[in-house]
Design a protein with these regions (language model features):
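Solvent-exposed, acidic/polar segments of extracytosolic/periplasmic ligand-binding ectodomains
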Residues: 24-43, 349-394
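Beta-alpha junction/loop-to-helix N-cap segments that form part of ligand/metal-binding clefts
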Residues: 24-34, 57-64, 72-144, 212-219, ...
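Extracytoplasmic "Venus flytrap"
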Residues: 31-65, 73, 86-92, 114-117, ...
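Periplasmic-binding protein-like
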Residues: 47, 102-114, 134-136, 178-182, ...
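Hydrophobic alpha-helical segments within soluble ligand-binding/sensing domains
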Residues: 95, 153-177, 189-191, 218-220, ...
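Extracellular/periplasmic bilobed ligand-binding domains
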Residues: 126, 176, 191-286
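An alpha-beta-alpha
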Residues: 150-214, 232-233, 309
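Extracellular/periplasmic periplasmic-binding protein-like sensory domains
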Residues: 247-322, 333-335, 339, 377-379, ...
Length: 394
């Protein structure tokens, strides 16, 4: 009986000592109590995408990259990775429902969604559950700005404006630019402001700023104003249809200048429409350069061509989907846990010069990536990288 009392006393002393060493009860639990979910046989990663509906094709491109990375790296910490699919159908109500499903299925991290609105819908649900998420092609600043558990693998829209301004001043050596942007388009207005602010900061001047109505048929009056001002470079953050018309009509008014655009131009449809325009007429920012030069770029291209054919060309969303998966995998390994979301998110944001297929990736304090931007043009009826803008941070 006496021995039992002594043993019980020692147990109580151990527990009290342990609690006094822990700042909170949560820390005690995390340190000494094994979570049953840590013992599961697979590690679950959520794939939150529109896999049906009118946005299905875009969701499939991101999913293709995620699945390719999963084939290359099928395990984490010795356990098989299970991809858990959540079809948000690009619908707000459905998005909320399937985001909650991912929480119930105890995924460790979520990848997606295509469409910033879809990610914004899921964000508070994932934040409440402390489940980190990585957006793949969302360029809306709000995705990360007000959502501490969301990061992104692509750069924000405004940074494209910054990169193009640097290209115009530092590579083209043109210090007088014009901007031509669609009226009432918040996205275009934001990236135009970023371009203009950086251009002026670098010593340039915005000679002329003109709005136009998207969907119009004739832009010659606006283009003549740029010609009269002698503008040699014009930033046009517009869709493919409007941009192609503007570029062709510039020839009609004999406006000799270079048009700068965003990654929206990196589509086969745009290439077909402007292929005859020439190398010196078009330059745009891109989310991916096949010549990025990292070992992971080579790994990605080798796996992609093996699966889809040597001549297959990966879409940028597929490359970024691949990077989102391998970044998530790295964060889980670094955290050493699949259930402590706050620690996983902390380790995710600590990545510096991480080798992705799209280049070296670091994160700032809110989860936006710090990465190089490829500037491309049309050459021999193909998109070709002509310059890389390397950000200087710190």
């Amino acid at each position: 009986m006496f021995k039992k009392k002594i043993l019980l006393l020692w147990v109580l002393i151990f527990i009290l000592t342990t609690f006094s060493a822990c700042q909170t009860y949560d820390n005690f639990v995390a340190a000494f109590i094994t979570h049953k979910s840590e013992e599961r046989s697979t590690i679950r990663i959520g794939v939150y995408e529109p896999l049906s509906g009118d946005k299905k094709a875009y969701g499939e491109l991101e999913k293709m990259g995620i699945e390719l990375a999963h084939e290359v790296y099928p395990t984490i910490m010795g356990k098989e990775v299970e991809l858990v699919y959540a079809d948000n159908q690009a619908d707000i109500d459905t998005g909320k429902t399937v985001a909650r499903d991912l929480v119930e299925k105890k995924v460790s991290i979520v990848l997606g969604s295509y469409g910033s609105v879809n990610s914004l819908v899921a964000a508070p649900i994932l934040e409440e559950a402390k489940i980190p998420a990585i957006a793949i092609t969302n360029t809306n600043p709000l995705v990360t700005k007000s959502n501490p558990y969301y990061s992104r693998i692509c750069f924000v829209e405004s940074f494209q404006g910054v990169a193009l301004a640097k290209y115009a001043v530092e590579q083209m050596h043109i210090t007088g630019a014009g901007v031509l942007f669609p009226r009432g388009d918040d996205r275009a207005i934001a990236v135009t402001k970023a371009f203009s602010d950086k251009y002026i900061q670098l010593g340039g001047t915005i000679s002329l700023s003109v709005e136009f109505t998207s969907g119009a048929e004739d832009y010659t009056q606006q283009l003549k104003r740029f010609k009269d001002q002698g503008v040699r470079v014009i930033f046009v953050p517009a869709n493919i249809r409007d941009s192609a018309l503007i570029i062709h009509q510039a020839k009609n008014v004999r406006l000799n200048c270079t048009f700068l655009g965003t990654d929206d131009w990196e589509e086969d449809d745009f290439l077909y429409q402007v292929a005859a325009a020439g190398t010196n007429v078009i330059a745009f920012s891109s989310l991916f350069d096949a010549q990025a030069g990292t070992k992971e770029t080579d790994t990605f291209l080798r796996a992609f061509r093996l699966k889809y054919g040597y001549d297959a060309v990966p879409e940028r969303a597929t490359v970024l989907g691949y990077d989102a998966y391998i970044m998530a995998r790295s964060a889980l390994i670094r955290a050493g846990t699949v259930v402590r979301g706050e620690l996983i998110m902390e380790q995710l944001l600590k990545h510096r010069d991480f080798e992705g297929a799209s280049g070296l990736i670091s994160f700032d304090e809110i989860g936006d990536p710090i990465k190089s931007v490829a500037i491309k043009t049309v050459r021999d009826k193909k998109f070709t990288t002509i310059y890389t803008v390397v950000p200087k941070w710190g």
